[in-house]
Amino acid sequence: MAYKSILVHADLSRHAPQRIAIAARLAHAHQAHLIGAAMTGVSRFYVENNRGMRGGAVAAQISALHGQAEQALDQFETLARQAGAFSLERRLIEDDEDGGMAVSARYSDLTVLSQHDDSEALPGAMSDLVPYVMLNAARPVLIVPRSGQFAHVDNAVVVAWDGSMEATRAIGYALPLLRAARLVVLALLHPPAGHAQPARHPGADIATYLSRHGVPVEVRPAVATDDIGAALLAMAAEVHANLLVMGGYGHARFREILLGGVTETVLRQMTLPVLMAH
């Protein structure tokens, strides 16, 4: 596959500039159309304030919500052009963050979000944004950590491989980045319960598949531990990786988010950008 359309969350968070810059550099490198999406949160505002506010107060609040979204899109446009994106689109969405980003992500090849930051409580910010989009969009999500600076995400890459459908999808979605990488390390994990064991040497088939796509890999067993998420992050640090690719495990019912242990660990403790697909 190729990235032809990249979506990035535009808001007024202190993490927005780095998120937008990474998305714009990827759009430039892959000659992709870049969409900045800002949510007004008007739908949630109506639900939470459907009684007790007079018409004038409602209109003023809605105007303020629109103003904040437009300000976020102004920042997106400025930063994206500075980073070299050549095809830009501003998208103002009358919805909350979770629903607005999940629906828009379905029509993009890659969505760029930031890791949740408990220390920054913006009005309308959703703590479950990343897992919600990952579990409801049927598209890959690139998550940028809340700490650190990341100039590149396609130099050295660690790929978590356990033979699962989620890991297979993540690799397929990451191919444009893997082809550009200097180093790709395949971290072998034990297959999830209920999955068939590989007939050949673990990792041989997926390594062959990747080599046919022009991606030579170095196969390594992950450290034997109960904390696989921490082991993956440790391996990424060891090889100086700037991207981790992995399947996102979890279940989404209504607005309840149920995540697998490895996914939850990585989303909470990530130290480098992570591409996840469910």
Regions found by a protein language model. Name each.
Residues M1, T78-T111, R212-L244, G250-F254, ...:
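Structural beta-alpha unit
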Residues R19, E97, M126, A167-A170, ...:
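Amphipathic coiled-coil/heptad-repeat helices and related helical stalk/stem segments
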Residues R44, E97-D98, E120, A151, ...:
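Generic structural signal for helix capping and beta-alpha/helix-loop junctions
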Residues G36, E89-L92, I143, L186, ...:
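A structural preference for short, hydrophobic beta-strand core positions in alpha/beta folds
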Residues G56-Q71:
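A short acidic, glycine-rich active-site loop
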Residues M1-G56, N136, Q149, V153-P221:
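Small/aliphatic-rich secondary-structure junction motif
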Residues I20, R25-A29, G100-Q149, M235-H278:
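Gly/Ser-rich helix-loop-strand patches that form or flank binding pockets
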